Design a protein with these regions (language model features):
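Long, charged, low-complexity, helical-prone intrinsically disordered regions
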Residues: 1-373
Length: 373
């Protein structure tokens, strides 16, 4: 489907991308409903990614509000295209989930015993499971070791046997998911609804990250293999169906896609004059391909880059002013103070007084968010 009416330009898409994502701050539940998915990351620099994302979109938001209020909200933690938080209705689209590997009999028996243990207690911290079963240590993804119980709980959560009931000090506390099947039973799906569910998941990803270059749309559909592995074989068909129903334009040789109901050239998509520090996982800057197309410079997330090789900083926050990401900031909270350093893609800060006033206002908002003011 091609967009009709006024020809769409890259400037239209850039303004549309910012304005549609930075909606008027609302309640926590409504903000997550509007976003559809909030990516999580455990690094605090100066707060977790999910908190840094929500502070721009939730009125009066403070660091840690999501973790504190999660048990009372209709939300789930799970893997979608990345790991994060979803409204329960979206979460249910991915379940029952068929894992990519079949458990051995021994593993299934371990899972059954753990499931019964958690069901009896209601909600369980991983250390309680480890103390009761003493599963030992296993190698983790980073080359070190972790408790085998923790790894088993992670897998049981992924398979839909458990849900995250709450967090304690950042650690997931698990409960039995209401619709959990037996751990050694193969998950089944309603084949008649598989295509519609897959389409809904693709639309959810598009809604979160639009407008999308074709390469990013392809990437997101590939990443759905993590959230819905049972429908991996349908990904190519789902991508083809998406390209048929989404609006589309080719600009400077790049194919772009966005929800068909939206008109990026509309005057309603008008970013404000504010200055904002964004998390690297914010939907405005998450797509590094789109970032370079929109703003003409390369942002890199360097938390896992050796310090001598970093160019921007450990956890550089993209710096948005109006409809441009003009640089980055490294922000830390230490000894009750906010400490900041900035870099600019153009080599120096804008001279306009409006920028400096806006930056001071953003830093004050950050202090309040972190409880420093």
């Amino acid at each position: 489907m091609y967009h009709r009416g006024m020809p769409v330009t890259l400037e239209h898409l850039r303004r549309y991308a910012i304005a549609r994502s930075l909606f008027k701050p609302t309640t926590l539940k409504r903000a997550i409903d509007k976003l559809g998915f909030v990516q999580a990351d455990p690094i605090r620099a100066p707060a977790r990614a999910q908190d840094l994302t929500l502070r721009h979109r939730v009125a009066g938001y403070r660091a840690g509000d999501l973790e504190r209020r999660y048990p009372r909200l209709p939300l789930e933690e799970d893997f979608f295209v990345n790991y994060g938080y979803l409204p329960r209705a979206h979460h249910q689209l991915m379940h029952p989930r068929t894992a990519r590997t079949v458990w051995t009999r021994t593993r299934a028996e371990q899972a059954a015993a753990v499931l019964a243990f958690i069901r009896e207690r209601g909600a369980v911290h991983p250390r309680e499971v480890d103390a009761h079963f003493a599963h030992g240590k296993v190698a983790n993804w980073f080359g070190g070791s972790s408790n085998a119980s923790t790894q088993l709980l992670d897998v049981m959560h992924y398979r839909g046997l458990l849900r995250v009931a709450r967090r304690e000090g950042g650690t997931r506390v698990y409960a039995v998911r209401a619709s959990a099947a037996a751990p050694d039973a193969a998950a089944t799906t309603d084949n008649g609804s598989a295509s519609s569910r897959m389409d809904a998941l693709v639309d959810l990803a598009v809604h979160k990250y639009a407008p999308l270059p074709a390469s990013t749309l392809n990437q997101l559909v590939r990443q759905l293999r993590g959230g819905a592995p049972q429908w991996s074989a349908d990904r190519a068909h789902a991508l083809a169906r998406a390209k048929q129903r989404l609006a589309h334009a080719r600009i400077d040789g790049v194919d772009w896609y966005w929800p068909a109901a939206d008109r990026p050239s509309s005057v309603r998509w008008r970013p404000d004059d504010g200055v904002r520090l964004l998390t690297p996982f914010d939907p405005i800057v998450w797509d590094r391909r789109r970032f370079e197309l929109f703003w003409g410079w390369a942002y890199r997330f360097e938390a896992y880059t050796p310090a001598p090789k970093r160019k921007l900083g450990y956890y550089a926050l993209p710096l948005l002013w109006r409809d441009r990401v003009i640089g980055w900031g490294n922000v830390t909270a230490a000894e009750g103070e906010l400490r900041c350093s900035f870099g600019y893609a153009g080599g120096r800060a804008p001279r306009e007084a409006a920028f400096h006033t806006g930056l001071e206002a953003e830093l004050m908002r950050m202090r309040v968010f972190l409880g420093l003011a």
